[in-house]
Amino acid sequence: MSSRKKMVLGGLFEANGYHSSAWLLPSAQDRAPTDVDYFRRIVRMAEDGQPDFFFPADTPAARTENPDAWTRGPLYMNMMEPITLLSAIAGATSHIGLGATASTSFYEPYNVARLFASLDHISHGRAAWNVVTSANDYAARNFGLDRLPPHDRRYAKAREFFEIVRGLWDTWEDDAFIYDKANVRMFDPEKFHVLDHEGEFFKVHGGLNMARPPQGSPVIFQAGASEAGKELAAETAEVVFGTGASRDEAIQFYRDLKGRMAKFGRHPDELKILSGVSIVVGENEQQAREKWAFWQENVHIDIGLL
């Protein structure tokens, strides 16, 4: 009897919906983007449905170029920092994975290592890091840059960034902390490893002042579809958000990415590739279609022209 493959399911979530008009529904909860109790309720409901992970949408910037237009469809204009949010959600859930984005273009490796190791401890081994290099100059301007560095340069930096973070997570071996009170030894020095990294982009001595994350390494997500992005994913990722405007394109992306893994010493089964679908929810099909029609009819011309 052949074994059945398990489909990986997750929820990517924006509090007022991904459609620019979703917030206009009378049932939309106005304060949801900054209401942690709302998120806890939503994720507990999701957990009851047995998905594998929850992933809040994020971008580290407000759109400032045309506020009069963005007020019509304010996607990403009001949202909490995702790692902090997931830490609050962790205590209200028990088994759903908790994923967040942190950009290798804007963070420092030591900070990312600490943040996701902490989330992994808080959630008892449910953290996931979505590794991105970012794609928008408007976000770069919040981090001392006029514009993003060139694409290939960003990915070279991302590779080094990832190696540092993974090395910091390996500062301590799993059984390094022994708490031997009789001999006054909290940890075994032989199981403490200083990274002492010096590379093209970063100089990080280490090590991480936190016990090894419960998973060893939090789950690694990526979404890059460029050549550099696919190379990094084939080398490092465990889950990739796939692309493709058609079934044939999705199949080609799947085969391409899986086919790159052998040169990095990895088996294709070590990587899951997920396709995205936007869902309009209603008590029945008619209600869902009416909701979709309402959204479409209420797309403001200012948003359509952005």
What function would you assign to each model-found segment?
Residues 1-92, 215-218:
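N-terminal beta1-alpha1-beta2 module of alpha/beta enzyme domains
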Residues 92, 97-143, 149-152, 157-161:
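Hydrophobic or amphipathic alpha-helical targeting/insertion segments
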Residues 229-239, 244-245:
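Long, repeat-rich segments with strong aromatic
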Residues 2-18, 152-215, 245-306:
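An alpha-helical appendage that flanks or caps ligand/catalytic pockets
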Residues 22-37, 101-110, 146-152, 214-227, ...:
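Active-site mouth loops of central-metabolism enzymes
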Residues 7-11, 54-56, 96-102, 125-131, ...:
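Hydrophobic faces of well-ordered beta-strands that scaffold small-molecule active sites
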Residues 9, 46, 50, 89, ...:
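Conserved, mostly hydrophobic/aromatic
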Residues 2-4, 44-48, 86-94, 120-126, ...:
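Acidic (Asp/Glu)-rich catalytic clusters
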